């Protein structure tokens, strides 16, 4: 596998070059602005492309090394793409509201995550011995915690890299990352402040198509990194389960012909439940499964 490919045309079609109105700009973004059209700043995509590539290389590197990557995007347009992309590449996300101290006060957040798991366990067991009112209260508490912590409950520690959509809205998250020296990849619109962003990517952070493109590229780079990391360690994820089924097939193969002789003499009713005949039918999917994995 290789890094995901993208082109100037893709960025243009996604509207990644459109900035904000000229009076809503941050002068620190001046070097990334190509010009203005109809009082709208136009982002210089010729600079965005190499910066985006650099960010994808970093993402792949962290993923290959087994690092954690946190996707952050709580604005309406980014919420769903952020969560979908993070789940697709087995990473973590915050897409509802950033709780102050999520990174800098991880111990307290861990306690909240433990409470969330406890609630999931209680409610998963149908809350035996609890009143309807109590179950309703517990459900509301769980749902509230799930919104804020659901995407990071399996993270197990602070991330090694953070990817952010809209630095203005996620300013607190970025401040916390900087305090902990966590590298930040961020999409920077013309009204953003590029200071403190380790891997800036000038681009439209409001258009849904542009956000989807950024998230897809990040997820693809992470998947590529994970595959590279597994290959380097000599582990083939696609074939990890394959040796189990052929082993069973080999063990069961000698026994498979045994029931054939008595099957002719035995009544039909007795032949049906023959326990030893069943594995022969089970052995066939093992080969099909191996072929699918190999393909």
UniProtKB/Swiss-Prot annotation:
Signal peptide as annotated in the record: none
GO BP field: translation
Composition-biased stretches (Low complexity): 264-288
GO molecular function: structural constituent of ribosome
Record has Glycoprotein as a keyword: no
UniProt xrefs under InterPro entries: Ribosomal_uS2, Ribosomal_uS2_bac/mit/plastid, Ribosomal_uS2_CS, Ribosomal_uS2_flav_dom_sf
Metal-binding is among the record's keywords: no
UniProt-listed Pfam families: Ribosomal_S2 (PF00318)
UniProt entry keywords in alphabetical sequence: Ribonucleoprotein, Ribosomal protein
SUPFAM superfamilies: Ribosomal protein S2
Annotated spans, Disordered: 242-295
GO cellular component: cytosolic small ribosomal subunit
PANTHER family the UniProt entry points to: 30S RIBOSOMAL PROTEIN S2 PROKARYOTIC AND ORGANELLAR, SMALL RIBOSOMAL SUBUNIT PROTEIN US2M
Family designation: Belongs to the universal ribosomal protein uS2 family.
Protein name: Small ribosomal subunit protein uS2
Organism: Phenylobacterium zucineum (strain HLK1)
Lineage start: Bacteria, Pseudomonadati, Pseudomonadota, Alphaproteobacteria, Caulobacterales
